[in-house]
Amino acid sequence: MPTPALFNLIGNTPLVPVTRLDTGLCQLFLKLESQNPGGSIKDRIGLSIIEAAEADGRLQPGGTIIEATAGNTGLGLALVGRLKGYRVLLVVPDKMSTEKVLHLKALGAEVRTTRSDVGKGHPEYYQDYAARLARELPGAFFADQFNNPANPLAHETTTGPEIWEQTGHELDAIVVGVGSSGTLTGLTRYFRQAAPNVEFVLADPQGSILTEYVDTGRVSDTSGSWAVEGIGEDFIPAIADMTGVRKAYTISDQESFDSARALLRAEGILGGSSTGTLLAAALKYCREQTTPKRVVTFVCDTGTRYLSKVYNDGWMHDQGLLQRPPLHDLRDLIGRRFDAGEVVSVAPGDTLLTAFNRMRSTDLAQLPVIENGKLVGIIDESDLLLKVDNHAEQFSSLVGTTMTSRLETLHPSANVQALRSTLDRGLTAVVAEGDTFYGLITRFDLLNHLRRTLS
């Protein structure tokens, strides 16, 4: 089969300087791996792993590629594998962004979702799950990025030489994250020969065990959880070579997401969650230096995969990652504040079809009905169903004829017990003071509040 021209677009990604963020005495450069055809640095290893397996006979025509992935390796494997005519079956943890999963399915990959709250050795851990599928399915090839030498080889033979050439052979440090460890290991091998004085700096999510390993040489048997996707580990990958790492930074989810958002606003670069982790660590490293250095880090993948998370104020607030000034009353529990312009609403003169479309597009079960800036009613899924059941033409009816207009409101100063009582009676919790409407509190909002309080 002829090599698809798309494969020629993998690699040779741009290297651009950071110009509007404080980098101290240093020059910081970003390698835009988001410009690969599949949108991430993992396109490199997708091609490398598949071609190596074809060369040694582990992957035969008509075979199935199986992998455990945080999404991006799966996208690289699906992009290459589907173009080459293979079936691609991927196992992903349930914390992966909706955009990644939809992208995988759109490429023709089959996706199995498993738990993200269990560790290596558990049958539902995504790597163990994928390995089991590979053993059970005839003709399957387990890509096994965490143990596959073709993973670091891709970076040793492409990413490393590109960086060295693009920096004009003037480079002091590279800031990397570690998931499978292929990027770090491959770059370490390349620069050990090309420029042994180049330092490696680890950017590690809070909860991962890797910073402690770099600092102490010990492998912790306890790890936490983190929302950043694609980097951080609860074990040391078999292919990992961390001997070149001179410093490691633990970066919280808050720092990671704030940094990704700052990068977009300051430099116009839309990167993913792990890009924020790397950037936060790179900026810390740069600002600590007392002499000028040239530093490279990565935009690991495109931020279009995280629009529903990192770049979604509602999601960020639900996770406790977007802070509002506390008001110390029920307004702090409202997920979408009306006075902040966050509420999706309808008007009495809108049709039921309009209400339905807004509920569907925003995944909401009820909408406030607003007229002249004031709350006049609530319409929910049950209202719609009662009106249109077996009468599809009723979608053209007006919201004002169907909405609930007799509302029981809660004053902002009401206590949480009053809120629970309202929700327990199956009512919508409307927070208002006189004619001033603040927003709705759902059961999910209350759960989020309790989770944030406990954490």
Functional labels for PLM-detected ranges:
Residues 344-363, 370-371, 388, 408-427, ...:
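The conserved cystathionine-beta-synthase
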Residues 244, 327-343, 395-407:
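Bateman (tandem CBS) regulatory domains
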